[in-house]
């Protein structure tokens, strides 16, 4: 029997580029992560992009990635890139760094 995709925990590292700083992107990301039950963190990078670590079920992560492709209304996302990460670490909450 195949494992239930909503039970296995996935961890994704994501970079979001575009107009994503100074537009409430991190704050909105925290709100969306809480709404979806995602754990991890989000942070600004010096190059003007935003990075995030997402942890949750496949369905939760997919829904969060879909939201990140647009972000909050003031954001202008031009690129979302990421990769699944293998880790034993389990985040307790979703935080803004």
UniProtKB/Swiss-Prot annotation:
<keyword id="KW-0378">Hydrolase</keyword>
<dbReference type="InterPro" id="IPR017968">
    <property type="entry name" value="Acylphosphatase_CS"/>
</dbReference>
<dbReference type="InterPro" id="IPR001792">
    <property type="entry name" value="Acylphosphatase-like_dom"/>
</dbReference>
<dbReference type="InterPro" id="IPR036046">
    <property type="entry name" value="Acylphosphatase-like_dom_sf"/>
</dbReference>
<dbReference type="InterPro" id="IPR020456">
    <property type="entry name" value="Acylphosphatase"/>
</dbReference>
<comment type="similarity">
    <text>Belongs to the acylphosphatase family.</text>
</comment>
<feature type="active site">
    <location>
        <position position="44"/>
    </location>
</feature>
<feature type="domain" description="Acylphosphatase-like">
    <location>
        <begin position="11"/>
        <end position="97"/>
    </location>
</feature>
<dbReference type="Pfam" id="PF00708">
    <property type="entry name" value="Acylphosphatase"/>
</dbReference>
<feature type="active site">
    <location>
        <position position="26"/>
    </location>
</feature>
<protein>
    <recommendedName>
        <fullName>Acylphosphatase</fullName>
        <ecNumber>3.6.1.7</ecNumber>
    </recommendedName>
</protein>
<dbReference type="GO" id="GO:0003998">
    <property type="term" value="F:acylphosphatase activity"/>
</dbReference>
<feature type="region of interest" description="Disordered">
    <location>
        <begin position="76"/>
        <end position="97"/>
    </location>
</feature>
<feature type="compositionally biased region" description="Basic and acidic residues">
    <location>
        <begin position="82"/>
        <end position="97"/>
    </location>
</feature>
């Amino acid at each position: 029997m195949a494992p239930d995709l909503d039970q296995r925990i996935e961890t994704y590292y994501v970079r979001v580029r575009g107009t994503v700083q100074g537009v409430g992107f991190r704050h909105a990301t925290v709100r969306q992560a809480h709404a979806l039950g995602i754990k991890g963190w989000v942070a600004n990078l010096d190059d003007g992009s935003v990075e995030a670590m997402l942890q949750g079920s496949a369905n939760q992560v997919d829904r969060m990635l879909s939201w990140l492709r647009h972000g909050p209304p003031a954001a202008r996302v031009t690129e979302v890139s990421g990769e699944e990460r293998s880790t034993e670490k389990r985040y307790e909450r979703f935080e803004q760094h």
